[in-house]
Structure formats: structure tokens, C-alpha cells
A protein has these predicted regions:
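Carboxylate-rich, polar loop motifs that coordinate divalent cations or form catalytic acidic clusters
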Residues: 1-151
Length: 151
């Protein structure tokens, strides 16, 4: 009788363990509204939106749909390159983007505008930016190829 009780208990535990929920994934691609299927980085902003940088702009996902932001020909308030490799958010809610051509941009989600960050604060000049670092205090550092560090 003890063996039967032990066997029933053991099988109950084994079946309960096997009944655990499997991992579930949802696949998002250009068919669901993503601008391009090559995703370089993902960022969750302070509002809970997910941002995806792709080879064709950046995409905001609010949990239901995507909105795409990309370069516009001839616009001064735009990206220099649609291929965005990395994104960072500062405490003010601005997104800092690093494009494939090593240019840094700041995106304001409130106005939905881009601003190219000039080298060392000189309008019209550019630097090859390798890394963007956002400190917890809000200070943003751009580490460049030949122009040192820009704050």
C-alpha cells in the first residue's frame, strides 16, 4: 500500500512539473509594421514604449502598433543615414542615436524631430562618433574617432 501511495504521489508531482507553461514568443517583422527586419538594438523608454533601431530608421512600438521615423531627403531636421546601429535614452526622454556612418543624432519623441549633433559644438562640423554614453545624472558623452570626447 505504501508503494502505491508513493507511486501516486511521485507521478502527481512529475505531471504537475511537466504541466508548466511553455515559453511563448511573438514574432514581429515588416509584415507587422516594422520598417525593416534587421534590428540592431532595442530600447525601452521611460514611458514603456519599445524602440527598435533597424537598417531603415527607428520604430516605436506601443504594444499594439509600430510607428517609423526615418531620414527625409533634403531635410535639415533629419537623420543622415537610416541605418541606426545603437540607441540610448537620457533622463530628459531624448533618444541618442548612432548611425552606420558614425554620426550622432538626438531624437525628441515629443516633437518627433531629429537633430544632428555637431562636433565639439561647432555647427556644420561632424565627428566620427564611436560610442555614446549617457550617465545617470543626464550628462551625455560622445566618444569620437579623432576628436576626443565631447560632452
Amino acid at each position: 500500500m505504501r508503494r502505491i501511495l508513493f507511486l501516486i504521489t511521485f507521478l502527481s508531482i512529475a505531471l504537475a512539473t511537466d504541466a508548466q507553461r511553455s515559453c511563448f514568443f511573438t514574432h514581429y517583422s515588416s509584415e507587422e509594421g516594422l520598417s525593416q527586419n534587421t534590428v540592431m538594438s532595442i530600447l525601452q523608454d521611460h514611458k514603456g514604449n519599445l524602440w527598435f533601431s533597424t537598417w531603415d530608421g527607428i520604430n516605436r512600438f506601443n504594444g499594439y502598433s509600430f510607428k517609423t521615423y526615418k531620414a527625409r531627403q533634403g531635410s535639415f531636421i533629419s537623420l543622415t543615414n537610416n541605418r541606426v546601429d545603437r540607441m540610448y535614452e537620457d533622463p530628459s526622454g531624448f533618444l541618442w542615436l548612432l548611425t552606420y556612418d558614425n554620426r550622432a543624432h538626438r531624437f525628441d519623441p515629443r516633437t518627433e524631430t531629429f537633430e544632428q549633433v555637431p562636433a565639439a559644438g561647432q555647427p556644420g562640423s561632424t565627428s566620427n562618433v564611436n560610442t555614446i554614453t549617457v550617465l545617470p545624472c543626464g550628462t551625455v558623452w560622445l566618444l569620437t574617432e579623432n576628436d576626443g570626447a565631447i560632452r
